[in-house]
């Protein structure tokens, strides 16, 4: 429990919610909405990190911010619900909500290069299954620009424009590093965990 909850947003004019939603909804909206409404005159910007999992499976076709959301994973369903809660918060109370849909995130210590260096690289081969990616610094840049030019109620996809099969990214990195030996599995291999496979529900 957070003590003195009423004063937690004193002096705050920018909020960024990166907490994954739970089955009963978004934790920030659920637990702090009344306080945020009280402080809305001083809150200039409110961002929410969602996920491209809200789109579901579009068979590898292009999607944008206007594409219908048809999530088929629990992760995507919860994100869609949380987005709706934030947008309702904006419509009902004029809280300056901005939603950012993120794909796979990479950066220092979190990339295929790091996995290759650590000997943990495993390529999962599934032809025609595309992933978009974004570097952590690009996320930070997008957030900074949004804060400087607020557009409440808007949704943004922050990702590259070159979606690719994950195994091709690994092979390219391995080629740059002159590494030839790493584990390779077909997607239907029983060794692949259900958690890993869940990331392949969306295409």
Report each predicted region and the residues it spans:
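NAD(P)-cofactor binding segment of oxidoreductase domains
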Residues: 10-48
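Rossmann-fold cofactor-recognition segment
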Residues: 1-3, 20
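Rossmann-like NAD(H)/NADP(H) cofactor-binding core
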Residues: 47, 98-101
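Catalytic helix-loop patch of NAD(P)-dependent Rossmann-fold dehydrogenases
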Residues: 59-99
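Conserved Rossmann-fold NAD(P)-dependent oxidoreductase catalytic core, especially the SDR/UDP-sugar
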Residues: 33-74
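Glycine/proline-rich active-site loop of Rossmann-fold NAD(P)-dependent oxidoreductases
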Residues: 80, 93-95, 105-118, 137, ...
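A conserved pocket-lining segment of Rossmann-fold NAD(P)-dependent short-chain dehydrogenase/reductase
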Residues: 112-134, 138, 142
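Mid/C-terminal beta-alpha module of Rossmann-like enzyme folds, strongest
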Residues: 140-142, 149-196
């Amino acid at each position: 429990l957070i003590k003195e909850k009423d004063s937690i947003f004193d002096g705050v004019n920018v909020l960024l919610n990166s907490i994954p939603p739970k089955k009963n909804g978004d934790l920030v909206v659920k637990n702090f909405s009344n306080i945020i409404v009280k402080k809305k005159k001083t809150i200039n910007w409110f961002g929410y990190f969602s996920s491209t999992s809200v789109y579901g499976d579009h068979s590898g076709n292009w999607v944008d911010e206007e594409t219908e959301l048809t999530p088929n994973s629990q992760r995507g369903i919860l994100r869609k619900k949380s987005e709706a809660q934030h947008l309702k918060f904006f419509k009902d109370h004029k809280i300056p909500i901005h939603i950012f849909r993120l794909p796979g995130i990479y950066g220092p210590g979190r990339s295929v290069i790091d996995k290759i260096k650590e000997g943990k690289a495993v390529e999962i081969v599934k032809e025609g299954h595309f992933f978009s990616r974004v570097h952590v610094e690009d996320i930070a840049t997008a957030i900074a620009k949004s804060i400087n030019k607020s557009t409440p109620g808007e949704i943004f996809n922050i990702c590259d424009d070159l979606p690719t099969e994950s195994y091709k990214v690994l092979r390219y990195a391995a080629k740059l590093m002159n590494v030839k030996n790493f584990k390779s599995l077909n997607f239907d291999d029983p060794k692949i965990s259900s958690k890993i496979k869940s990331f392949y529900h969306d295409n």
